[in-house]
Amino acid sequence: MSTTDDTHNTLSTGKCPFHQGGHDRSAGAGTASRDWWPNQLRVDLLNQHSNRSNPLGEDFDYRKEFSKLDYSALKGDLKALLTDSQPWWPADWGSYVGLFIRMAWHGAGTYRSIDGRGGAGRGQQRFAPLNSWPDNVSLDKARRLLWPIKQKYGQKISWADLFILAGNVALENSGFRTFGFGAGREDVWEPDLDVNWGDEKAWLTHRHPEALAKAPLGATEMGLIYVNPEGPDHSGEPLSAAAAIRATFGNMGMNDEETVALIAGGHTLGKTHGAAAASHVGADPEAAPIEAQGLGWASSYGSGVGADAITSGLEVVWTQTPTQWSNYFFENLFKYEWVQTRSPAGAIQFEAVDAPDIIPDPFDPSKKRKPTMLVTDLTLRFDPEFEKISRRFLNDPQAFNEAFARAWFKLTHRDMGPKARYIGPEVPKEDLIWQDPLPQPLYQPTQEDIINLKAAIAASGLSISEMVSVAWASASTFRGGDKRGGANGARLALAPQRDWDVNAVAARVLPVLEEIQKTTNKASLADIIVLAGVVGIEQAAAAAGVSISVPFAPGRVDARQDQTDIEMFSLLEPIADGFRNYRARLDVSTTESLLIDKAQQLTLTAPEMTVLVGGMRVLGTNFDGSQNGVFTDRPGVLSTDFFANLLDMSYEWKPTDESNELFEGRDRLTGEVKYTATRADLVFGSNSVLRALAEVYACSDAHEKFVKDFVAAWVKVMNLDRFDLQ
């Protein structure tokens, strides 16, 4: 019988056909657009973390709430928790010190300096994929142990801050003196979708160091925080692990000394867990049944907890005092001879064959063990460069303590951006080069000063294109992930930014603005650069018949060259900036995807990205002065011409060569080439979502709205690093 007959019969019985059958009709079920078109442009990445997902609302002020926190009482509660062993997850040696250090470490350790994404700054360990990564087994228990404290203090302390503070308190409770703690990490309420964790489809897929160099992600295997502790691809070879260790720690901005200190310091306390084979371990939190309530990795081996716990599958205790800080890691590393063995779970590890039984059992005081080490621990002894550092730390424990304190602080604060974002009573006074330090302000320009400066800029002979371009070049280095870059500091005038190809305009424009700064001595160069953009946009809007005052907030300062880490700032150089029609390499993603990436780093929404590109094109801000995307006969006028001409069916677009990167727009009737464009231009007509936005600004009644929206988005970018205004 046909489907039609089936439906007819159902209707004739009075039953609704849509209530029959077993198909999943819930929202979001079924085949999605990305199933049909897997290469679909990810415009949705620009819609993350909106107020619609934030239960606290847009008026919530975390810094204000934190100021109400009884910080001393919170630390006291955390200290008490460390020895309050719970039967559902008993503490090793009666202390959660090692567990909380690992939780903080693995939260921060996803950071990578190449794009500033990852890290502990938003409490992402609560969400997939990190909450269910193979390397994060049992950290769900650490977070549940913290819940009563989070519940007690509520919104006065974010999860993101609490995770790191718990690690700090654990170190302090072990007798270690930390470098300090800066709060200020604000929670988000959904997983980050923009972080590229890699292309692998299976957990623990090995990445060769050469591949890591081309795509510097945070780990050497999918699902790990750093490296495989059994060596690359479970090789069991300490020496072969050296390259992987350097690659992954280097991708976080760590040098060899910091790397050695972090590995040794992290392995001075606690243990790994590998009581039996991984086959006993159940589903991770995301895959666990609903009754598990977000807990995962339930073990069927013995009690499943305590002495029977399975986490990494390795069963290693490094030191004689696993809950107290010591130099035993290095002492044991060099004192004993190590032989390869296997854990009860079958994982490769090393045992000190000539050592007495000096390691306490975590649950039976009558038992002792020989010292054990991970494959990657022995790398610190057998790699020549790591060995030099390790022996120095062996012979100078104070140097080790200082190095670890600083490296731990860097690890846990690396993605927070400038020190101006830190809050709390334990913020260190010392400025550190990786914080991109800035000097104290020298100027407090008045409104009259600003008016006079604008007049001087307007009379300088600079074009609208030059003024707008130099301001964008200065501000657009900002990265929302780790809050680095931006206009404050005027680092556009310093190495390495002044020498980037994309910033060619700086060589022409900065000398003019520097002369104005010296002559007037009323504002910083950083402020004058941004003010030049203000002048350019106001002139362009006036030429379009719209009188508008572009908001300007003075107060920026000028960084010195010695406050600028050239190597680390080199990572901010864009491989593409679609706002300026710039692309340095064609072997990395598509031009339009890189435009989305840039917009996401600038925390822009899709409408903001759209209006900025359209406005910058008609203002002639292409990095090389080309006419690509300049769809107007009146450049320098802040018009909607980009959108109107892009969507005009009078033109037909065709690629100029097989690269499909550059296109010609020809008149359909005459065949005459009217415009040229890149993929960063044409995407606003080809992508259905972006075309819908472009159509808004192409309408005849959109001109005033366009100018206002452009100015609002522009000011947002100029002030992204003005944390003093936020």
Swiss-Prot record:
Q: What is the reaction catalyzed?
A: H2O2 + AH2 = A + 2 H2O; 2 H2O2 = O2 + 2 H2O
Q: Which cysteines are joined by disulfide bonds?
A: none
- Does the record bear Cytoplasm in its keywords? no
The molecular function terms in GO held by this entry are: catalase activity; heme binding; metal ion binding
Cofactor: binding details = Binds 1 heme b (iron(II)-protoporphyrin IX) group per dimer.
Record flagged with keyword Iron: yes
Tell me one GO biological process term.
Answer: cellular response to hydrogen peroxide
Annotated Gene3D superfamilies? 1.10.520.10, Peroxidase, domain 2
The record, for PANTHER family, names: CATALASE-PEROXIDASE, HYDROPEROXIDASE I, BIFUNCTIONAL CATALASE-PEROXIDASE
Q: Quaternary structure?
A: Homodimer or homotetramer.
Q: What protein name is recorded for this chain?
A: Catalase-peroxidase
Q: Which organism is it from?
A: Salmonella paratyphi B (strain ATCC BAA-1250 / SPB7)
